[in-house]
Amino acid sequence: MGNWITSTFLRFDLFQRHQPNRFLEYTRVQHSNQSPAYSVRTAAEIVAHQRMKPNHSNDSDTDFSSDDEGCPKMTPHEEQQMFEREQHIAFSGRCHIGDPESCTQLRNEINSRCGPRPSTSNNMEFILNRDLQKRGTSISNPRTVARVLNSHLPNQKRRVDRVATKSFCTQYIQNGTKIVVASQDEKIRFYQRNPDKSKYRSKYMKSDELRVDQCGWSILDTAISLNGDLIAYGTWKDAVFVGKLDFTERQNITWFPIDLNGEPGRDHCAVFCVKFSDSSEQIVCGTSQYSIHVFDVEQRRRIRTIVNAHEDDVNSVCFADLGSNLIYSAGDDGLVKVWDKRAWSDGDVEPVGVFAGHRDGVTHVDSRQDERYLLSNSKDQTIKVWDLRKFSNMSGVEATRACVQSQHWDYRWQPAPPGLCQPVAGDTSVMTLRGHSVLHTLVRANFSPESTGRRYIYTGCARGEVVVYDIMSGTVSRRLKGHTAVVRECDWHPTENEIVSSAWDGVTTVWTWDERQEGVIAPYDHPNISQFGDEDSCDELFQPVKKQCRRQRKTMSSRGHPCSSSSISQN
């Protein structure tokens, strides 16, 4: 068996050059007293390593030279410059403009709604921000509000809660007065903001806790109706569960399952995403059976099913416009599709358009609510912005399909392979943003709210960060570090410069702006930038200085206490 293993797998031309000795070691031990199981394990490891290795078709079959041979020599100073340059690119993000005309129109529209981002050193902007932060005080000009908020992006964190389980979903509800968080322990928790007159008015305290009726592995998505009286969730069950929110009787909530297939009790299907329409009369969801379902909430029944809407799991759906006539969907086939409900009455359930350009599955899709632009977040580690007027042609769709089918890695436990940044032929996206990590779970990205002029795109990250991209510059405006595990979802407050995030470390965090942090927090081109978002920046952790009587101060001074004035003068 050892000879068969050797002849089948041990082709040294397939190994990476920088690790030849690792596999040559096997030739030294293959004739020793090793068990067949050891041989099989070694061969399997070689095959797995080959799958993750990029193809070097032009390499010589007998070239075992070091990678350093043939490379230009660099001085230590040049190496340091290269490291700093690559570090700057990694932190500031990368942007590729695919459609200059649409990108210019988008940026002009943003500039007309909020203007250029002012400097935080402007005293007038600080005064406006102070007035804006006062409860009961409002600035009537939306453009001024957007300028103020955009000049004071969140930069410090405040922990809301920590649970001993993974948190999957989080969002603001009831105009930002409450936060809802869904976790793997089959619970949905609500956090209420303290009253405006409270000393800690920016703090959120847990007010309610609901246990779901049925759950498979975890709650995968939650949705709250616009008026806040209905809640829906999806999990590994063949149903969407809907309940009426009544916080006065929160322990007696009744969940009504709406079956997907008319066969209750089956649980091999997953509902990855759930969304209410603006009128709260309908719910749309995407499933692991490649299908999209639309439900009537009042009648609690399924009114439309699009079978094989995608060629793989439907990871995300959303209503595109205020009338809830258009639906965006995204799946593991790497495509984003647009559906028009108005055409369904004629029996036409085909998409009205398709966007192609990703090299791997799409994890989330979001509408800019302007009936023109949308975004998609993908396992190819990019966010793409699309123009609704410019769909992809069939050649672009086929190119995307070929790229997705050529992927042989699993984002749930493997690192992203090289080559994902190469553009796809027929990509019609407006711009492509890169600078965050999409691993382990369906990480979500969204446009910032209307109060910011929808200038930013923010997303969770597998590195435990909240990454905020500026559409105007195409770079990272904020990289909020504070979690120790993947951030699956985050949400921007509808009217204030505040972001909430929940992660697999069980921590729910609210990010706000603090003027004291601007001394150490700056854009990534600042020469003194190091790290920010640390919890030490929060004044809630500062220890208060206790008052001491005069006799105690004299005693400490005579004993040479390290905090006494005499001790300080001696040092």
From Swiss-Prot:
Q: Which residues form a coiled coil?
A: none
* Each WD repeat, start to end: 162-201, 266-305, 309-349, 357-396, 435-479, 482-521
Which stretches are tagged as biased composition: Acidic residues? 60-69
Biological process terms from the Gene Ontology for this record are:
cellular detoxification; determination of adult lifespan; negative regulation of cellular response to manganese ion; negative regulation of transcription by RNA polymerase II; positive regulation of multicellular organism growth; proteasome-mediated ubiquitin-dependent protein catabolic process; regulation of cellular response to stress
Effect of gene knockout: Increased lifespan. RNAi-mediated knockdown significantly prevents Mn(2+)-induced dopaminergic CEP neuron degeneration. RNAi-mediated knockdown increases tatn-1 expression and enzymatic activity.
Q: Which GO terms describe its cellular component?
A: axon; Cul4-RING E3 ubiquitin ligase complex; cytoplasm; mitochondrial outer membrane; mitochondrion; neuronal cell body; nucleus; striated muscle dense body
PROSITE patterns with a match to the protein in the record: WD_REPEATS_2, WD_REPEATS_REGION
- Give the protein's function: Involved in regulation of lifespan. Required for dopaminergic CEP neuron degeneration in response to Mn(2+). Inhibits the skn-1-mediated up-regulation of tatn-1.
Its protein name is: DDB1- and CUL4-associated factor 11 homolog
- Gene name on record? wdr-23
